Amino acid sequence: MSKLNAYFGEYGGQFVPQILVPALDQLEQEFIKAQADESFKQEFKELLQEYAGRPTALTKTRNIVKNTRTKLYLKREDLLHGGAHKTNQVLGQALLAKRMGKKEIIAETGAGQHGVATALACALLDLKCRVYMGAKDVERQSPNVFRMKLMGAEVIPVHSGSATLKDACNEALRDWSANYSKAHYLLGTAAGPHPFPTIVREFQRMIGEETKQQMLAKEGRLPDAVIACVGGGSNAIGMFADFIDEKNVKLIGVEPAGKGIETGEHGAPLKHGKTGIFFGMKAPLMQNSDGQIEESYSISAGLDFPSVGPQHAHLLAICRAKYASATDDEALDAFKLLCKKEGIIPALESSHALAHALKLAYEDPNKEQLLVVNLSGRGDKDIFTVHDILKEKGEI
């Protein structure tokens, strides 16, 4: 029986109740078979093209870095059906679930983007869908909650713990433990127990593959750096995967620094956490001196996650990728700038990556460089949040 690597260096693994091991083994075997099955790959490719709208554009910005010698491109995952990169891997996993004969899908969601993507895939492929969502997130992401319901999903608010994403993850795993024979747990990021980090990466890697081809066509060379925001890390690993062996391309992940790293109110476990076991994996984790999980914080619900995917931890450990952070205010400034200068409303998550790219462009305006930001999602879901913050600041 062929097996995938369960670890990335020391990170990853499969720390789950014994009852779930057969379900994870089945998932791994079916994934390996599906990857070797031309008809599965063809169906996935067709859904991505005909339904989701791939390939997405690689847009050269016109105005935002005008006074520098930086060329800044945006990989437009915001243009994907569903509004974010999430749709890619959800279609892949939903097809995999059908292949395994599962009729129900369980998912968790933070910002609601993964929930919406799961709901649309389930509607399309005729699967029953239930989504766990922290009660706090249900409040702050009401448009996405309604979208999920419109597409036939059952949305279950989670009131335990901090009533955010980590609690929704725990409830979803609990449900799966009870129902794995008929339900597939459609995990929303490149984290969690093996084989999820690998499956999600492979179902997102077209982001980097397309970027590479588009870049060569437009500029005749690869970029100096690709930059992506990191919560759990799926959009970033999708962008990085095809560039890992291209040693001249810097991989830069941007974690949320929230109100500032020094305040403790952030979501940057890669640089400021300690290794622990959470959500079925060994990974960097925000924890206090007693080893209890600390609350993560970010202006963007989708980055508000106290851990990170194991491959990112490994890429940092071997110095292949670099991880920076951007504060709420920096992300907000980048958000406003992209709206005003380019006519694109980005997700607050993606705005963290953009903020770091702008920092690179402006700290040395005379440096010639070619940068790509993965614009992982559109900002429609965030306009009410931004409106309230700007109102509070007296800017509108």
UniProtKB/Swiss-Prot annotation:
InterPro entries according to UniProt: Trp_synth_b_CS, Trp_synth_beta, Trp_synth_beta/beta-like, TrpB-like_PALP, TrpB-like_PALP_sf
Pathway membership, UniProt: Amino-acid biosynthesis; L-tryptophan biosynthesis; L-tryptophan from chorismate: step 5/5
Transmembrane segments: none
Entry annotated with the keyword Amino-acid biosynthesis: yes
UniProt keyword terms in alphabetical order: Amino-acid biosynthesis, Aromatic amino acid biosynthesis, Lyase, Pyridoxal phosphate, Tryptophan biosynthesis
Enzyme class: lyase
Enzyme Commission number(s) of this protein: 4.2.1.20
One GO CC term, this protein: cytoplasm
Cofactors demanded by this protein: pyridoxal 5'-phosphate
GO MF entries: tryptophan synthase activity
Catalytic activity, reaction form: (1S,2R)-1-C-(indol-3-yl)glycerol 3-phosphate + L-serine = D-glyceraldehyde 3-phosphate + L-tryptophan + H2O
N6-(pyridoxal phosphate)lysine: residues carrying this PTM: K86
Entry function: The beta subunit is responsible for the synthesis of L-tryptophan from indole and L-serine.
Subunit structure: Tetramer of two alpha and two beta chains.
Family: Belongs to the TrpB family.
Descriptive protein name: Tryptophan synthase beta chain
Organism: Francisella tularensis subsp. tularensis (strain WY96-3418)
Gene: trpB
